[in-house]
Amino acid sequence: MQKLAAALRAAENFRDLKIAEGLFYAGRRNRELAAVLQLSENEVSLVKHRLIKRLSQFVREAGQLISDTVFTGTASAGLLTAAWESLRPSCPKRTTLGKYSLGILPPNWEDYVRFHLDLLGCSFCAANLAELQAPVDTAEASARLNRLQQSTVGFFDRAGS
């Protein structure tokens, strides 16, 4: 899954990445995703088929035997969702979330991050974004830096000896 998400991100193929997230992470149906992404249900089905083939290929390359039918059915869908949630292969990096909060992402990235946060509701990324947007208590940050510097003074003195 990480390899698939990385390949889609590298190619800036956000349409397919949104479909992958919607299907494998959020467990959305083809029809629902088609409506949200303003695509035909056939387009979503075709992309889903290609994504499943790529996932199967990646698993085979990793040395595991798998059949194309493993990704169908309720149990497998739950397994994919759990794995996607655990690995978070399509979550934007904190730097990307920071740029999103500042409004300086390229339009295609901004659209993807908005989809990931607002439509899929990724709680991990929402928490990261909230942390990035939280006001900084400068007095607390200064006290923390001072404690850090005080705790390392002896270490650096010994390192030079």
What residue spans do the PLM features occupy?
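C-terminal edge and immediately downstream basic/flexible tail or linker adjoining helix-turn-helix-like DNA-binding
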Residues: I52-T95, A134-G160
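Short amphipathic alpha helix immediately N-terminal
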Residues: L4-E32, K93-T96
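Short, amphipathic alpha-helical interaction patch
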Residues: L80-D118
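Short, Lys/Arg-enriched N-terminal segment that forms or immediately precedes the first helix
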Residues: M1-L8, E43, G78-A83
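Short alpha-helix boundary/capping elements
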Residues: F24-R29, L105, G121-F124
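DNA-recognition helix of helix-turn-helix
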Residues: R31-Q64
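A short, amphipathic alpha-helical patch
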Residues: K48, V113-P135
